[in-house]
From Swiss-Prot:
One of its GO terms (biological process) is protein complex oligomerization. Its main location: cytoplasm. Belongs to the TorD/DmsD family. TorD subfamily. Involved in the biogenesis of TorA. Acts on TorA before the insertion of the molybdenum cofactor and, as a result, probably favors a conformation of the apoenzyme that is competent for acquiring the cofactor. The gene is torD. It comes from Actinobacillus pleuropneumoniae serotype 3 (strain JL03). It comes from the Bacteria. GO terms for cellular component: cytoplasm. This is Chaperone protein TorD. The lineage of its organism: Bacteria, Pseudomonadati, Pseudomonadota, Gammaproteobacteria, Pasteurellales.
Amino acid sequence: MAHSQLLSSEERLFCYRWFHSLLAKELSEPQLQALQAGQFASFFAFLAELGFQPQVTDLQNELAKLTAYDSPRLELAADFAQCFLLEGKLSALPYASYYLDERDLSENLAVMDQWLTKFQLKINRLHNEPSDHLCIYLEVLIKLIETEQPVQVQQQFIRQQLLGWLPQWAEKTAQIHSSTAFYQIISNLLLGFLQQDIT
């Protein structure tokens, strides 16, 4: 049964907000400390119950390994840049435009523009964040859940707006050579969660 039917809206919101917080920008010191201090232990157990035990174990192992670094946060910041901020041949750019052809992208962004207008979501021009950034999609999905849009609408958004390109992004992220596998694991976990959310 899909998460959208199995889980409460609050549980799904927590999950998608968590993914958004990890992928929107480099982790802050408080974010990393919370992860390492076990503040998300119950959440990790929750993910494991949903069938993501391998990813949870890998993530916990990576968090443990970070303690060996003099500056774990800076190490993760470097990994974030390596995974997502360099040019396309070197990074897994988190933009739909990098993976969709012109026609599919045009259709995808037309739907996105409708939802952005409906929810009055403003793109962060200060950081030059295009509307096809992964985290903008997650913001719209969060709004769909918050405003209690029909489950079919939420699932259609995931299927058509995200899963048309996210598997390629996650696959490319998995191929990036970085100091840790933190973001590779998070990307794989997000993809798996989205796929379960519509099945």
